[in-house]
Swiss-Prot record:
Entry GO MF terms: endonuclease activity
Name of the protein: Protein 7.7
InterPro entries xref list: His-Me_finger_sf, HNH_nuc, Homing_endonuclease_His-Me
Organism annotation: Escherichia phage T7 (Bacteriophage T7)
Length: 130
């Protein structure tokens, strides 16, 4: 396989590149895919066969469903669990978040994570094993 072409600009919290194109924040790997092959269909994601979120080498990109992407992560042993899921939170933090009466916003500020992260914890979409 050819070497990755790594994005050297800004990245998001998950390590994916990000850039502005026509007033919209996009990931470089999706942008290069769409520039090469056209729009990605709704409900489809651009996957990295190299498992490098900063890579935008068109030869390392393929389309799949979110389920395909999740199965690929599990097959390759890249699906984080527990405290590996977020370096910012521990299991005791999650238990405290679930028992708190503070707002999602306040909890996010307190623990240094997004409000949506707090929501996913409270809805047991993440940290389900606790």
């Amino acid at each position: 396989m050819e070497d990755c072409i790594e994005w050297t600009g800004g990245v998001n919290s998950k390590g994916y590149g990000r850039k502005w194109v026509n007033g919209k924040l996009v990931t470089p790997h999706r942008h290069i895919y769409e520039e090469t092959y056209g729009p990605v269909p709704t409900g489809i994601v651009v996957m990295h066969i190299c498992d490098n979120p900063r890579c935008y080498n068109i030869k390392h990109l393929t389309l799949g469903t979110p389920k395909d992407n999740s199965e690929d992560m599990v097959t390759k042993g890249r699906q984080a669990k527990g405290e590996e899921l977020s370096k910012k939170l521990t299991e005791s933090d999650v238990l405290a978040i679930r028992s708190s009466t503070l707002s999602h916003r306040s909890l996010g500020e307190l623990y240094g994570v997004s409000q949506s992260t707090i929501t996913r914890i409270l809805q047991r979409k993440t940290w389900r094993h606790i």
